[in-house]
């Protein structure tokens, strides 16, 4: 480090996670410069220049014990994290420091967490499908390789379990590198995930970045750390998977420090820069002509309200949205994906083929008809329906149950072994139901099975 890099300043104000530091007027730190507290490893990141040599910073760690007058040194560069193969199989914090007690990360390359998004002419569109082995996703809202997917759901409907199953199915089949960013989620889940990856021997292909629930908001703002690692693999010409759980905590952390940074709150108390912050992040999660980033992001929906500014801002950036519904979860159907609310840009006969497209639309029409008839059934009962409507309702209830599926990651809790269903089998199964080839089977036969053949087997046992 040059001597110019070690300009010293003094803390003049501490309010929660926001710290004001005064420097000599002629050597004020730049926005996003990293400052280090003298005698400790605590890092502050410059957010605003207030003038007269004073900068406002966010503390990336606990601010316990800080007081006015402490010395802070300016590193004169943004926060940089290790990237490349040495990060694989390791757990890192927001600053790229290892937290798995397995020694330092010996990486030759570091990269600033603040990067520009790729230029428009570098982007690469993708129409190649990514099979997940989860029936409802492959049928209703298929993923594109190099696309962005959001898992939307309220508290306790299964976002993390769905995310884990996707990681289990895709990361193991994929064979490439993955980056997992745990942003403000439960430490227990992070620990479970680490051991699961270890047990299935894919840990050496995954880089883990954790900023958990108990950490100050500055840490959760840094979903950028994981993204920077994923971008590096992409720029090396690799196809990488990027998982984020949970993108809402990133927004929430911004909300927590926004008022302390002196900004006026906007709708529902969110930061006024919500759309810009989300845009900056999402535009970087993209595929270029060098390599692809396929990202799956869990998005918490406050009070199950999809029109809340945070999930609503995220919607526009995604290629596929998987909406988890409390009503479906209350029926005991897992994964609790709402087939009428979930969408994908891949649902196009030119992309997924005519057969897949028509089966998807027929399944949705049948379910929509059942939804419309539900009120009539509740008041007058099934007997008042026409024979066609009775048939539609019977098929819809079978479809609804056939959309459920036992998960590998939930095997410990449910006792039933997980099922991976290939796309061809999924299409064949739903085609048989909508064509009326399963009208003679009881609806219980379709609950928690994999392929349609298993439903026939189950029906024999029931009868």
Curated annotation (Swiss-Prot):
Membrane topology term reads: Peripheral membrane protein
Q: Give the UniProt subcellular location, in the record's own words.
A: Cell inner membrane
Q: Which InterPro entries match?
A: AAA+_ATPase, ATP-synt_VA_C, ATP_synth_F1_bsu, ATPase_a/bsu_AS, ATPase_alpha/beta_chains, ATPase_F1/V1/A1_a/bsu_N, ATPase_F1/V1/A1_a/bsu_N_sf, ATPase_F1/V1/A1_a/bsu_nucl-bd
State which Enzyme Commission number(s) the record gives: 7.1.2.2
Q: What is its main location?
A: membrane
Any one GO MF term held by the record is: ATP binding
Q: Which Pfam families match?
A: ATP-synt_ab, ATP-synt_ab_N, ATP-synt_VA_C
Q: Subunit info?
A: F-type ATPases have 2 components, CF(1) - the catalytic core - and CF(0) - the membrane proton channel. CF(1) has five subunits: alpha(3), beta(3), gamma(1), delta(1), epsilon(1). CF(0) has three main subunits: a(1), b(2) and c(9-12). The alpha and beta chains form an alternating ring which encloses part of the gamma chain. CF(1) is attached to CF(0) by a central stalk formed by the gamma and epsilon chains, while a peripheral stalk is formed by the delta and b chains.
Tell me the function of this protein: Produces ATP from ADP in the presence of a proton gradient across the membrane. The catalytic sites are hosted primarily by the beta subunits.
Regarding protein family, the annotation reads: Belongs to the ATPase alpha/beta chains family.
User: What name appears for this protein in its UniProt entry?
Assistant: ATP synthase subunit beta
Please report the organism this UniProt entry assigns to the protein: Burkholderia cepacia (Pseudomonas cepacia)
């Amino acid at each position: 480090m040059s001597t110019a890099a070690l300009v010293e300043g003094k803390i003049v104000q501490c309010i929660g996670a926001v710290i004001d530091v005064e420097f000599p007027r002629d050597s004020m730190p730049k926005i996003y410069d990293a400052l280090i507290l003298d005698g400790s490893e605590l890092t502050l990141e410059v957010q605003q220049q207030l003038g007269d040599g004073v900068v406002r910073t966010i503390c990336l760690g606990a601010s316990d014990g800080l007081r006015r007058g402490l010395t802070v040194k300016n590193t004169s560069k943004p926060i940089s994290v290790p990237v490349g193969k040495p990060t694989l199989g390791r757990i890192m914090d927001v600053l790229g420091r290892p937290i798995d007690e397995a020694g330092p990360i010996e990486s030759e390359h570091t990269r600033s967490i603040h990067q520009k998004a790729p230029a428009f002419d570098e982007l690469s569109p993708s129409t190649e499908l990514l099979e997940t082995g989860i029936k409802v996703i492959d049928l209703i809202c298929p993923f594109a390789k190099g696309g962005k997917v959001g898992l939307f759901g309220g508290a306790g409907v299964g976002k993390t379990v769905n995310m884990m199953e996707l990681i289990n199915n895709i990361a193991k089949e994929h064979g490439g590198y993955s980056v997992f960013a745990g942003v403000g989620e439960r430490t227990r889940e992070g620990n479970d995930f680490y051991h699961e990856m270890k047990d299935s021997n894919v840990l050496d292909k995954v880089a883990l970045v954790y900023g958990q629930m108990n950490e100050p908001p500055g840490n959760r703002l840094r979903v950028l750390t994981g993204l920077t690692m994923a971008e590096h693999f992409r720029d090396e010409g690799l196809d990488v998977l990027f998982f984020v759980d949970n993108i809402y905590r990133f927004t929430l952390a911004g909300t927590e420090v926004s008022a302390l940074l002196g900004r006026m709150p906007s709708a529902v108390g969110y930061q006024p820069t919500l759309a810009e912050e989300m845009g900056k992040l999402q535009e970087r999660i993209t595929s270029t002509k060098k390599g692809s980033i396929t990202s799956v992001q869990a998005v918490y929906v406050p009070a199950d309200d999809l029109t809340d500014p945070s999930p609503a801002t995220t919607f526009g950036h995604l290629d596929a949205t998987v909406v988890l519904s409390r009503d479906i979860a209350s029926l005991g159907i897992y994964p609790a994906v709402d087939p009428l609310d979930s969408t994908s840009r891949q649902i196009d006969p030119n992309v997924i083929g005519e057969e897949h497209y028509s089966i998807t639309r027929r399944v949705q029409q049948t379910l929509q008809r059942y939804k419309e008839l539900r009120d009539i059934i509740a008041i007058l009962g099934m007997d008042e329906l026409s024979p066609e409507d009775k048939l539609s309702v019977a098929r819809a209830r079978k479809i609804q149950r056939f959309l459920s599926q036992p998960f590998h990651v939930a095997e410990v809790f449910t006792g039933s072994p997980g099922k991976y269903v290939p796309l061809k089998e999924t299409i064949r199964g739903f085609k048989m139901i909508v064509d009326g080839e399963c009208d003679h089977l009881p609806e219980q036969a379709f609950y928690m099975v994999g392929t349609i053949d298993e439903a026939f087997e189950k029906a024999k046992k029931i009868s």
